[in-house]
């Protein structure tokens, strides 16, 4: 990165820090104008993780909170809205919390974490403990919000449920102005509770907390909540009639989470890496919120931060590496029926599927059926929508190369689990390989291909398609005890796919995998064997004492394969 260029804000979610420390910032302050003009008392934005939700919440806090520093907004879109700035900038007490850290293996641990989050926020307003505008009993209640013992907040359960409402009422009373409430990652406590078995207790706590502060609260100017999922009204928003939910299918605010194509081109140009545009678009674009197509901000920023110093950098999986990806693993495991398996194959091939989407699920029902899982995949960013059929059913697709590669990785991972469970078939396949029984290798490998989800991706080059079948073979061979397996290592005059040394028997295997364009399996097999001979791949095995070496040319096309073998012995 050149001296004088703005730094890239990798992992920074503080608007104030980004502006104060001169980081590169893509202007999303137009969201402030829309919030005020389109006005809803309670706004819930649901977007996948790493799409700028927390940064936007930080931006809202910086704009509305009393004591706002106007210089933070100089040169930004909202600064041109002089009347809005005059009436709203720095005019409100703001309660701003993130529930991202509210988790634990038990309800007690999680509720203690919630006390900590709310207690620390209440600590930001120490003047309330001496405010002459509060009654003595109210000042005592405020003190109870911030009291600690041995480093832990001690507020009672009934006060915890009332805590946000109570704090908003005290702030409004002290300042004579209504309060703006910002709750980031509102659904994380429910997600963690579902994982660890105390879901009903957490639902009851969050429902009470939210209803008290959001429903008929005279001290509330408006509230903004963000999260990944829209949780059913019947679950935690019971009786809340003023809730405006803005999901990935809504056109309102469509460009304020994620980077637009123009914004990405400007960023690449600023850092003099416009030549990376094609790769960035293929790997990180493709998400559709409302009618807007956007890039994942996390991916773009991470890639650019490394690409400026490495012109040969190939796109990496940044977004998918920030999660356990348990959702996609469950999805692949649930593809038991032939219909669902063919649907996954269609998605990986770049096609769209029409599915009815439910945006108001509960965590208890997320994994009840494959139909619910489609909705979850859309909400969490593993799939995106390409338009609607009737307002309830949407055209779903994998957004980009990054997520497509994640699907492939999980498909191979599931395949390996299945191979490990079927020891009898594994033994038969390996026995056929080490004896040069090409017809049996072909039959068993075809069975394996039929068992797994096939890859017929029209968007990638042939070597990438070959890598998938290569991965299947490695997934099989990796479980064979006593076999030393090497993959894609440099040989005397080039690279070969797979080398296997069976030390106890002085047998070696050389396997070259080819993807058969247009299904020309015989021709692809011959090319594979010819490559093994011409590139002298067998030299390493001879040097290591193998006296029998089988050369395998394996050609694949979707769920078909052809196997040819040549034997050398001395």
Q: Can you say where each PLM-predicted feature lies in the sequence?
A:
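Extended alpha-helical interface modules used as scaffolds for assembling large macromolecular complexes
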Residues: 243-244, 295-536, 561-570
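P-loop NTPase motor core
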Residues: 11, 62-127
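Substrate-engagement module of ASCE P-loop NTPases
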Residues: 122, 163-174, 201-221, 537-540
